[in-house]
Amino acid sequence: KADNVRVFELGRVFFPDETVGDSETTVKGVRQPLHVAGLVYGDAHEDCWAEAKRPVDFFDVKGDVENLVAPLKATFEAATHPAMHPGRCARVIVNGKAVGFVGELHPKVCRVYELPKPPVVFELEVAPLCELDVPSARAVSKFQPVHRDISVTVPNDVTCAQLQDAVARIRRTKPEAMIIESLDLFDVYRPEASAEKSMAFRLTLSTQGSEAIGEKDAEAAFVAVEQAFADLGATLRK
């Protein structure tokens, strides 16, 4: 048995679909979308003095999927799939459309094949990943970005994606939030037997204007983010 495996496959899958007719590229009654699938098993990286040895996990392959669909942005939501672990599986969404799944192989399948560690697998539909807009150049700001860390306490059922989506909405609708460049999660703490968790984000502000971001502008953007978080039940940690 191989200790470490990295494999992928690109090919067509077949579904019955009576809306499909005969043509030079199709067969009546059969839909044949192109899919890409991959499997990672074993250690997360080769032996290295700078890295502790550990098995590959869900988040390693989630990162691979994000790199695969770039420059499009993938989001993930908890899901179930008959071939995947019921608690370690996510639906992959690109441009608002579900394009596939990523997750650990189901424990029952691992037992059948006597695998001591669970492989992490993914499968994606290819066509939506090719729907790219023509990129447009963006001027580089003359000023350094402003960073501010935000720590909040949120109910356990509130996800990072929900909070980031809320901030994306206010960027489009509130003038004071348009200087927000990104909101990145860098820490999560879940106390035992608690209905809440703590999440820490780094807020980055940037402007293409002729003036640097002032303290009042930064504070207004921060308050807008705080209000967006509050709508989801998040409270600012003092």
Question: What residue ranges belong to the model's regions?
Answer:
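A carboxyl-terminal module marker
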Residues: 2-11, 17, 24-25, 31-32, ...
